[in-house]
Every structure is written in structure tokens, then in C-alpha cells.
Curated annotation (Swiss-Prot):
Recorded name of the encoding gene: FLI1
Taxonomy of the source species: Eukaryota, Metazoa, Chordata, Craniata, Vertebrata
Protein name in the entry: Friend leukemia integration 1 transcription factor
Compositionally biased region (Basic and acidic residues): 215-226
Oligomer and partners: Can form homodimers or heterodimers with ETV6/TEL1.
Function noted in UniProt: Sequence-specific transcriptional activator. Recognizes the DNA sequence 5'-C[CA]GGAAGT-3'.
Length: 452
């Protein structure tokens, strides 16, 4: 008789684990986990209550997995989010297993489901972009988040009749009207993560390596640390690296971007600096002369547009420099020692980690080319400086003048008494030309030699 009943019930449900005697006995224990179900009381707030043994529904909480699938679904942009939820079955006679209106998904490329997925799990497909969610998708996501993160006291009626676009428009204050601060941070963080992840480029190939998929939950011990995940850092999802396929696509786009020609950018500058005008050419100017012509790329060439260059044939560069300086014994060792002289002058530097690579410092070259004042000009006094008499207290001092020079000799016993004739006489004064300024306590002009 018992065999007949089991055979009849097996036709109704495909889950044989429901009829295991040990499993059925354990099912009468009180359940305290939040499970995603398709019960019609979605509009009411969730409450965590033990399920009595006489209840019509027996929920079997199982592990919930969330995985990002980066495959295109029929060419659309709705790259799915794969959520696994528990499947609930009625225990009354003739009842069918409730599919909760989730769309089942079988990954043909990956073969059978992973070992950690039991027969009580059923996958659902929702778009990767939350703005494309329907009201049903929002309900599925909310029920999954409640079960996955152990959220309590959420007014689910607040999210009723709300699609993905309306959900993404909610801010923190809106979420706080429906739940606590902790739950708000968890929901907002996960929603932000999904929106940012949906912007990543997807692989357009027909097959995707399973190892490149982004798995949110992989470790069975995830439940012990999940409260420190989304809730502790709202932006933790933004720091995740893009998938392998997206990284390859971005690197390919970077390589395809046209690079500027360094000879067009640095050519005029190299030609101008390489021309010494008069005098002998220096080694750094000779190198700029070679770099100004792309025909010399076989021995020396630019590496980018920041002044870095490389000697592809250093022996040829040394040979050409020896010809210019009439030194047939010139080699790269001697040339490299000569280049070290320019390091301290900020004309060029050695690029570490690269052989035969150097970098010009155009700012240092500009400073090195500025004219410096000669030594004789430092002792030359400007002709437009007016000097005051020596008996004034504020005497202007000039460089390299003795602090206490000898006083000017006079012939009159009364120096101040004869001052009027001394200064006012147009022809008898010591200065032949009265317009010449007086320079006391300084170098005496040559025309006063007869006076002294």
C-alpha cells in the first residue's frame, strides 16, 4: 500500500527527496530562515516566525547562489543575473510544485549543475541591468536579498508595483522609509554594484570560459561574513576588477588608438636645439641632430613624446660621433661616460631598467642655454647711478669698494670756505666738464690723473 502511494505521488512531483522518510521527519522541525516563496502575501511585511508542523506549505531553505552571466542572450543587452532560489512543493494530494513564476535556466555549455546545487534549487534569470527589471524581477531580487543577507523588518509593500527604473531612482531616504539603516546600506550597495557591473563590456564570442565569470558567492563559509560585506562598505562592489573578456577588449581598444608621431612633435625642437650656431657641437646636441631625422631610426629613435630615446645601435652612434669629432677610436663606453656629465646639468637622465635608453630634460636644456653674465660685467658700474657727496650719512655702497677709502686731498686750509669757488668756477674746477657726475670714494676717472 505504501509503495502505491509513493508511486502515485512521484507522478505529481519530480523531487524524490520529499518522500525520503528521514528528510520528511526533519521537515517537521521549526524553521527560522527567510526563504523566497511565491506566496500571495507579498504585499505584507516579512516576519520571521517558526513554521508550525501543521502548515500547508513546507519550505525547504537551501543555498542561494548569485552569479553574473556575461553571455549575450539572443543578441540582447540583457546579460542575465542568475539567482538560485528554493523550490517549494505542496504536500496536499494532487498539488503541483510551485515554480514561483521564475524562469528556469539550463546552461548547456557548462553541462550538469555544480555539485553544491541540490535538486531543491531552481534558477531564475533577470536582466543584468536593474533599470530593465520588471515588477516581478524587483520582487525576486528583494526576496533573494532578504534570504541571502538575513534582512529583517522590511516593508515589502513599499516595493510593490515598482519596476527597475523606479527602484533605481530611490535614494537612501526612500529606503529608510521601508526598512532600517543596515538593510538600506545592504540593498543600496548591491543595487549599485549591479548597475555598475552592467556597464562593463561583454564578450561577444559564443562561448565563455567559466573561470572568467564573476561569482558573487563562491565559498560555503560566506554566511559567516556576509554582514561585513555589502553593509560595511557600500562601494566595495565598485572596486572589483572587470572580467577577463572585458579587460581584453579594453586593452585591444587602447592598442588600436593611434599614437602621435614623436618625430612630428619633437622634430622642430630637436632641430632648433641641435644647431649650436657658432662654436663646436656638443654630444647632446649631436644626439638631437640624429633624432631630428627619422632616417636615423636604425641607430637611434624616440621612445614616445616625453623626451625618452633609445640607441638601437649604440656602436653606430659612437662611430658617427667619432667621425664628427675626428676620433676614430670612439666607442659606446667612452660615449656613455661622456653622457654622465650631463646628468648633473639636468640635460638628460638615464632611464633605469632599459638598456641604451635615455631621456632629455628640455626644461634643463633651456636653462643651460640661457646666457650667463661675464665676470667683467660684475665689476662695471652703471653710468646712470647718481652718487651723493661723501659727507652725507647715507652713502650708497657699490660692490668691491673698500669700506673706508682715503679722503680726497685738498689744497685749501679751509675746505668749506672755498667751496663756493671750487664748485661754481666753470673753468678752474677739477672737472673740465661740469656735466660729468662726481664719483667720490670710487675709482677715479682717467682725466683726473693730473690733479692727483
Amino acid at each position: 500500500m505504501d509503495g502505491t502511494i509513493k508511486e502515485a505521488l512521484s507522478v505529481v512531483s519530480d523531487d524524490q527527496s520529499l518522500f525520503d522518510s528521514a528528510y520528511g521527519a526533519a521537515a517537521h522541525l521549526p524553521k527560522a530562515d527567510m526563504t523566497a516563496s511565491g506566496s500571495p502575501d507579498y504585499g505584507q511585511p516579512h516576519k520571521i516566525n517558526p513554521l508550525p508542523p501543521q502548515q500547508e506549505w513546507m519550505n525547504q531553505p537551501v543555498r542561494v547562489n548569485v552569479k553574473r552571466e556575461y553571455d549575450h542572450m539572443n543578441g540582447s543587452r540583457e546579460s542575465p543575473v542568475d539567482c538560485s532560489v528554493s523550490k517549494c512543493g505542496k504536500l496536499v494530494g494532487g498539488g503541483e510544485s510551485n515554480t514561483m513564476s521564475y524562469t528556469s535556466y539550463v546552461d548547456e555549455k557548462n553541462g550538469p549543475p555544480p555539485p553544491n546545487m541540490t535538486t531543491n534549487e531552481r534558477r531564475v534569470i533577470v536582466p543584468a541591468d536593474p533599470t530593465l527589471w520588471t515588477q516581478e524581477h524587483v520582487r525576486q531580487w528583494l526576496e533573494w536579498a532578504i534570504k541571502e543577507y538575513g534582512l529583517m523588518e522590511i516593508d515589502t509593500s513599499f516595493f510593490q508595483n515598482m519596476d527597475g527604473k523606479e527602484l533605481c531612482k530611490l535614494n537612501k531616504e526612500d529606503f529608510l522609509r521601508a526598512t532600517s539603516l543596515y538593510n538600506t546600506e545592504v540593498l543600496l550597495s548591491h543595487l549599485t554594484y549591479l548597475r555598475e557591473s552592467s556597464l562593463l563590456p561583454y564578450n561577444t564570442t559564443s562561448h565563455t570560459d567559466p573561470s572568467s565569470r564573476l561569482n558573487v558567492k563562491e565559498d560555503p563559509s560566506y554566511d559567516s561574513v556576509r554582514r561585513g560585506g555589502w553593509g560595511s562598505n557600500m562601494n566595495s562592489g565598485l572596486n572589483k576588477s572587470p572580467p577577463l573578456a572585458g579587460a581584453q577588449t579594453m586593452s585591444k581598444n587602447t592598442e588600436q588608438r593611434p599614437q602621435p608621431d614623436p618625430y612630428q612633435i619633437l622634430g622642430p625642437t630637436s632641430s632648433r636645439l641641435a644647431n649650436p650656431g657658432s662654436g663646436q657641437i656638443q654630444l647632446w646636441q649631436f644626439l638631437l641632430e640624429l633624432l631630428s631625422d627619422s632616417a636615423n631610426a636604425s641607430c637611434i629613435t624616440w621612445e614616445g613624446t616625453n623626451g625618452e630615446f633609445k640607441m638601437t645601435d649604440p656602436d653606430e652612434v659612437a662611430r658617427r660621433w667619432g667621425e664628427r669629432k675626428s676620433k676614430p677610436n670612439m666607442n659606446y663606453d667612452k660615449l656613455s661616460r661622456a653622457l654622465r656629465y650631463y646628468y648633473d646639468k639636468n640635460i638628460m637622465t638615464k632611464v633605469h631598467g632599459k638598456r641604451y635608453a635615455y631621456k632629455f630634460d628640455f626644461h634643463g636644456i633651456a636653462q643651460a642655454l640661457q646666457p650667463h653674465p661675464t665676470e667683467s660685467s660684475m665689476y662695471k658700474y652703471p653710468s646712470d647711478i647718481s652718487y651723493v657727496p661723501s659727507y652725507h650719512t647715507h652713502q650708497q655702497k657699490v660692490n668691491f669698494v673698500p669700506p673706508h677709502p682715503s679722503s680726497m686731498p685738498v689744497t685749501s686750509s679751509s675746505f668749506f670756505g672755498a667751496a663756493s669757488q671750487y664748485w661754481t668756477s666753470p673753468t678752474g674746477g677739477i672737472y673740465p666738464n661740469p656735466n660729468v657726475p662726481r664719483h667720490p670714494n670710487t675709482h677715479v676717472p682717467s682725466h683726473l690723473g693730473s690733479y692727483y
